Amino acid sequence: MQSDNEDNNLEAFFGMIDSIEDDISEMLEDENSELSGYECLVISFNCLTLFCRQVEIDFGQIEDHYSESEKSRSYENFKGFDSVSNLHEYNEVGVFSMALEEIENTLTAFEERCKKTGEVFDEWNCVFIMYACLRKYCDQAKVNYGEIIGDVLNLQSSLGKHEKTESDDMNN
């Protein structure tokens, strides 16, 4: 049985996915905004790292676990993006939207499996599944993961500085 805190964390996790989809939709509606698959990945990894911080999941541990499972190939083969074998047939944002849909489908399948097997369906496993699917998307789209995380950290740093400046201005 899951605690209320775990249920709230799962609710927040799925809310995060919805907010990613909403952010991408809003940017697509803005005529002045140019959006590519790369920006979609930055948005997603930014939200994922912020969620991890919020629920006290060590994002580095997720990265390490992924690296280890990638070496041993012992992880479950996430449906991921095998169905999106030719990424160039679609526009990048369309492909990324399909990737988010696949993440949701993978999470639903994992939740169903957990109900049958008694495995734990918690925020850590959800974060890992989403992370693994996003990394698989990076690999198939030939996007440098290190650059994405660098951009995420720069974004978070500049937002943190901006928030601090606003806070200082309000206190003066």
What are the residue ranges of the model-derived segments?
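Short acidic DE-rich linear segments
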Residues: 164-172
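Charged, low-complexity interaction regions
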Residues: 28-39, 63, 114-122, 142
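Asparagine/serine/threonine-enriched low-complexity, disordered tracts
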Residues: 5-8, 39, 50, 56-58, ...
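Short amphipathic alpha-helical heptad-repeat segments
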Residues: 9-22, 92-106
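An amphipathic alpha-helical micro-motif enriched in hydrophobic residues
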Residues: 40-51, 96-99, 123-137, 141
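Long, low-complexity or tandemly repetitive, helically biased scaffold regions used
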Residues: 58-95, 110
